[in-house]
């Protein structure tokens, strides 16, 4: 059996790299009063930036504090620039694997730049917690944070190539799952939550997961007819169709929007907090509502952008034409391309609406009625966990099928 198709080996590699990433979260940065930092964690300037995807993690400034955030920010920048610069768009859609490798290299260089900026922004806020504040401390801590971010990116790459799933998504998935497990144990054994409250909370999570799975797995069946079918008895069969996912973007729009929102929050709160305009805006529209609206706008924007990159209507139309496959009542070429574009727009609109609703609904209930629907767990985090879990299961099945096929051949 080929090593790349060995599911056990890939699972072992994935667990190995995840263990290294988790280990790095518990290695503290030297020269910092961790107790003071922990006690002031919820009020200090960098907590929101560090805990984008894992709100309940231990409030400790570790070597992996930045995590995968610089890489996500670099990905966001590349996605936005791709829509503005044809050269980048060409690398993504037309140049195949070579183009993807070039784009991946650019993303990594950009990740380093983001890691440097974010590390420096964090270090300059650590004067209160440093044992000895001087130039040596600033340089040393900045280099440690940058190195940690680059190492996490390397671990994510290794998970993608040697393990199962997309490395960045898997790391985010593990961090969120770990945070939720910690929260759940805390509620059960420390706060002694009532059984009825726990049962209601658990039932609500199960219902939410069911809704997420339903929408994530839902497809729009586009009927197709091949040239071979014209000469066979299966001409009128409904078994031949092209599946288009309703939520084509998956969890990526949520991941990108969450990361960008954390950056915006940091800039507004600690970069523009002295401006009178910020207080004026807050008087008109509370920041809580403003950020929820901004979050929804980011989700919709990234969903449309990501869907346009995942599914190229022109290429899909051309591939069907080359394979002598047509859609009933739709002419090949431009008409087929327009059909796919209109269909994808409708599906993306529904998918964006679903993503925005599932993020807004619990926050709206909490803000208006003061009911905490998902105590300790953001529904966007739940969406990421479920989405990544589905992808991991699908990829595992692919390796199992590949293994069975090899056994049949040999």
UniProtKB/Swiss-Prot annotation:
Transmembrane regions: 61-81, 106-126, 135-155, 170-190, 195-215, 248-268, 289-309, 349-369, 373-393
Topology in membrane: Multi-pass membrane protein
Source domain of life is Eukaryota
| One of the record's GO cellular component terms | chloroplast thylakoid membrane
Principal place of residence: plastid
- Which one GO biological process term can you cite for this protein? intracellular protein transmembrane transport
Which InterPro entries does the entry mention?
A: SecY, SecY/SEC61-alpha, SecY_CS, SecY_dom_sf
Determine if Thylakoid is one of this entry's keywords.
Answer: yes
- In which compartments does the protein localize? Plastid, Chloroplast thylakoid membrane
Identify the keywords attached in UniProt to this record, alphabetized. Answer: Chloroplast, Membrane, Plastid, Protein transport, Thylakoid, Translocation, Transmembrane, Transmembrane helix, Transport
Conditions for induction: A monocistronic transcript.
Quote the Gene3D superfamilies the UniProt record gives: SecY subunit domain
Checking Pfam families in the record gives:
SecY (PF00344)
* Family according to the record: Belongs to the SecY/SEC61-alpha family.
Q: Kindly give the NCBIfam families that the UniProt entry links to this protein.
A: 3a0501s007
Q: How does the record describe its quaternary structure?
A: Component of the plastid Sec protein translocase complex, which is composed of at least SecY and SecE.
Explain the purpose of this protein. The central subunit of the protein translocation channel SecYE. Consists of two halves formed by TMs 1-5 and 6-10. These two domains form a lateral gate at the front which open onto the bilayer between TMs 2 and 7, and are clamped together by SecE at the back. The channel is closed by both a pore ring composed of hydrophobic SecY resides and a short helix (helix 2A) on the extracellular side of the membrane which forms a plug.
Its recorded name reads Protein translocase subunit SecY
Species name for this entry? Cyanidium caldarium
What gene name is given for the protein in this entry?
secY
């Amino acid at each position: 059996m080929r090593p790349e198709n060995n599911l056990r080996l890939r699972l072992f590699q994935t667990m190995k790299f995840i263990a290294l990433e988790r280990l790095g979260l518990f290695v503290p940065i030297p020269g910092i009063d961790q107790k003071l930092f922990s006690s002031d964690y919820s009020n200090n300037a960098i907590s929101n930036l560090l805990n984008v995807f894992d709100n309940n993690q231990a409030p400790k400034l570790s070597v992996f504090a930045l995590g995968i955030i610089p890489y996500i920010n670099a990905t966001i920048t590349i996605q936005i620039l791709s829509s503005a610069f044809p050269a980048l768009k060409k690398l993504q859609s037309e140049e195949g694997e070579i183009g993807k490798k070039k784009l991946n290299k650019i993303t990594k260089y950009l990740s380093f730049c983001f890691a440097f900026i974010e590390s420096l922004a964090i270090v300059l806020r650590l004067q209160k917690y440093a044992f000895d504040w001087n130039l040596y401390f600033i340089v040393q801590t900045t280099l440690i944070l940058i190195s940690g971010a680059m190492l996490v990116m390397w671990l994510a790459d290794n998970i993608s190539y040697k393990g199962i799933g997309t490395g960045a998504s898997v790391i985010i998935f593990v961090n969120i799952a770990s945070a939720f497990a910690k929260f759940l144990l805390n509620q059960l054994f420390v706060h002694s939550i009532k059984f009825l409250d726990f049962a209601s909370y658990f039932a609500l999570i199960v219902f939410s997961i069911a809704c997420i799975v339903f929408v994530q797995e839902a497809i729009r069946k586009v009927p197709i007819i091949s040239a071979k079918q014209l000469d066979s008895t299966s001409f009128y069969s409904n078994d031949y169709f092209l599946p288009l996912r309703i939520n084509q973007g998956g969890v990526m729009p949520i991941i990108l929007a969450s990361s960008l929102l954390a950056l915006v929050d940091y800039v507004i709160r600690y970069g523009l907090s002295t401006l009178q305009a910020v207080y004026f805006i807050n008087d008109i529209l509370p920041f809580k509502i403003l950020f929820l609206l901004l979050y929804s706008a980011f989700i919709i924007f990234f969903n449309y952008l990501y869907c346009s990159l995942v599914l190229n209507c022109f290429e899909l139309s051309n591939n069907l034409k080359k394979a002598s496959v047509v859609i009933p009542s739709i002419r090949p070429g431009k008409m087929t391309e327009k059909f796919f574009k209109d269909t994808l727009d409708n599906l993306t609109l529904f998918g964006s609406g679903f993503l925005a609703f599932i993020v807004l609904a619990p926050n709206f209930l909490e803000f208006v009625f003061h009911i905490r629907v998902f105590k300790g767990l953001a529904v966007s985090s739940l969406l990421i966990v479920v989405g990544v879990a589905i992808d991991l299961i699908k990829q595992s099945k692919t390796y199992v099928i590949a293994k069975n096929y090899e056994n049949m051949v040999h």
